[in-house]
Amino acid sequence: MNSALARRVEELQKFKSDFFGRVRELIKGRKEIRIVGDRFVFQSEVLFKVGSEELGIKGQEEMAKLAITLMDIEKSLPTDIDWILQIDGHTDNLPVKKGQDYLDNWELSTKRALSVLRFLIKQGIKPDRLSASGYGSFQPIDKKNTSIARAKNRRIEMKITQSTKTNQ
């Protein structure tokens, strides 16, 4: 049993490595999309208009490329490898303006992550391979109170990880 589990973990690692390698080629030389540790970081300005949860044209193009890469690599994976693409939305620390469609940054970050998730499903990614979370302004990557720091903190992060579903 342990050898089977070790094999699945090894295959998931290979999948992650292949995926990262292919996406790295897609984003080569682009500052607004980067790899940080085991995550892809897309700046919100690439994907969304300011204060909006809807993917813009450029955001749709980027997510379509990502979906094609993910589906292509998934074809070579054994079917018993349980993985998910975790999509995390983050905002800056400025409050949502009055009159906007969001109560707060928690809601905006969550709706942005869900917007990416739903777009990927429309592109053919299986829903059970996706998960979305919103963190509002509470996990900044730059804690300075400057416009540059706020721009860095407005982002979507994606990570391939092992699924937590259990076989019951």
What is each model feature region?
Residues M1-R34:
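Extracellular/lumenal/periplasmic "stalk" regions immediately C-terminal to a signal peptide or transmembrane helix
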Residues N2, A6, Q13, S17, ...:
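Periplasmic OmpA-like peptidoglycan-binding domain that tethers envelope proteins to the cell wall
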Residues F20, R24, I35-Q43, Q168:
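C-terminal targeting/interaction modules of large eukaryotic coiled-coil scaffolds and adaptor proteins
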Residues E25, G29-E32, D72-S76, K122:
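Conserved helix-loop functional segments at active or binding sites
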